[in-house]
Amino acid sequence: MPDVLRTLLLNPPSFENFDGGASSRWPATREIESYWYPVWLTYPAGMIPGSRLVDASPHKIDWQQTVQVCKDYEFLVLFTSTVGFDSDIKLLTKIKEANPSLKVAFVGPHGHIRPEETLNASEHIDFIVRGEFDYAVTEYAHGKPLDQILGASYRKDGRIVHNAPRPQLHTEELDKLPFATDIYKRDLQIERYNVPFLLNPFVSFYTSRGCPALCTFCMWPQTISGHAWRVRSVDNVVQEVKNTLEYFPQIKEIFFDDDTFNIRKDRAIELSQKFKPLKFQWSCTARCHSKYEELKAMADGGARLFIVGFESGDPQILKNIKKGATVEMAREFMKNCRKVGIKVHGDFIIGLPGETKETINKTIEFAKELDCETIQVSLAHAMPGTELHDQMTKEGFLRVEALADSGGHQLPHIEYPHLSKAEMMDGVNRFYDDYYFRPKVVWRIVKDALWDSHERKRLYHEATEFLRLRSERLQWARQGGDHPKPMVSMAGTSTGGND
C-alpha cells in the first residue's frame, strides 16, 4: 500500500436535483433547486494529500461522469443517506466495474444507524464508519489497518466486525481540523450553491458540533453529531471567517450551519463582538430561548436572519416531541428579533404525535401571529435512527417505510387513525395559503422586489414554482394521497431540514 491512497470524497448524484449529502438534514430532491454545502466531507479532504472532493448534484456531474472520475482513484469515500442509499449502491456497482481495485468506504447517518445492513447491501463496500468519520477515513488513506481504526465496521472471515467507537472530537481537536472553506476554494464552485431565503452566493460552515436539545424527530444529533455540544474556539471561527471573506469577495453572507448556533449566550455574544469589525452579514440556525441582550449583540455583529424550528403552535405537541421550547418563548423571541432587526425563517411540521385537525388550525394561527419573514411547512418524517421513528414504528403509524419515491421526492409516510395523509397534506396547502396570501405579506414581498433586482428575479421564479406545486399538492390530496410524487416542501421555503 502506498504512503497515501489517491482518495476521492464523493457526494453522489443519487437523483437529479438531489440535495442529499454531507450536511443536508432532510435528504431529498428539491422541487425548487437548492443545495447545502457538503461540509462533513471537507475535513478529511483537507487532511488527505492529493485528495479531491466531488459534490456531484450542484455541479451537474451525472452517473457516467462520476464513474469516469472514479477511475483515477484508489480509495472512494462515499457519503450516503437513507433516501439515496439504493441509488448509491447501483452507482457503486458501475464504479467498481470500471475500477475493480478501488477501495470503498460508506459514511453518513445511514451506515451509522444500520452498519450491518449497509455492508450486506454490496460486496463492493470495504468498510463503513459509524459516527464522525474525519480521522477514520484519513487513517485508512494513510495506510492504517482496518482493525486499528476506531468506528470502522467491516467484514472479516465471513462475519461483520465492529471496532470500538471513536470518541467525539472536542475543542482542541476541532480547532486542528482544516477549514471547510479551504476545500471549497480548492474543489467547489460556490455559485453552484443556493438556498432561497439566504443571500446568494453564500458560504456555510460549522462553528460547533452536536446539539443538547432532545427533539425526537431531528436526525443529526441522534446519529452523527450527537447530543454533546462541542465548540470550536472563537479565534478559530473568526480566522475562518476572515479567510472566507478573502477567498470569496463575491459572497453576500455567511451561514453558520451548526445544529444550533445560539446554545450558549456568552459564546454567541463573544463571536458577535469579534464579527462586528469584519463588517459582514451572516445568518444561522437558532432556538427561541435567546433574550434581548444576546439578540442585540448578534444584530450589532451583523446577524441578518435566523432559521428557527417552531414546529407547532400546540403546547402538548411541543411536549410530545421534547422540543424544550414553549409558544410563550416563541412569542417573546419574535418580539425581540423585530426590535433588533433580525429576520426569522420559521419551520413548522404537520403530523407530529398528537396532531389533529384542530391543532393544525392552531399552528396556522400561531404562525400568522409570529409573522416570520418566510416559512417552511413540512409533513412529519420519521427518519431511521430517531426516537420519532421508533415511536411511530411501535405505535403502528408508519404507513410505509419508504421516505421517498423513485426520484428522491419526499413521501408522506405517517398516518393516524383520526388523521389521514391526505388531510395532513391539505393542512400544508391551507397553511401556505393562509400565511402568504395575507395583504401585509404580499406587500412585504412586493416591496422587497421593487428595490432589489436580484430579489425580484428570485421571487418571480419562486412564485411560479409556488403556484405549480400548490396545484400538484391539491391534486394529490383530492386523489386521496396515492399520487406517486407529493410535493411536501414549498418554493422559497425549503431549509434542508434545519431545526
Give the positions of each predicted feature.
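Radical SAM enzyme core and accessory elements
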Residues: M1-L9, R30, G50, E74-F75, ...
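Short glycine-rich His-centered loop
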Residues: V4-S34
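Glycine-rich beta-alpha loop elements in corrinoid/cobalamin-binding modules
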Residues: W40, P44-T171, L379-G385
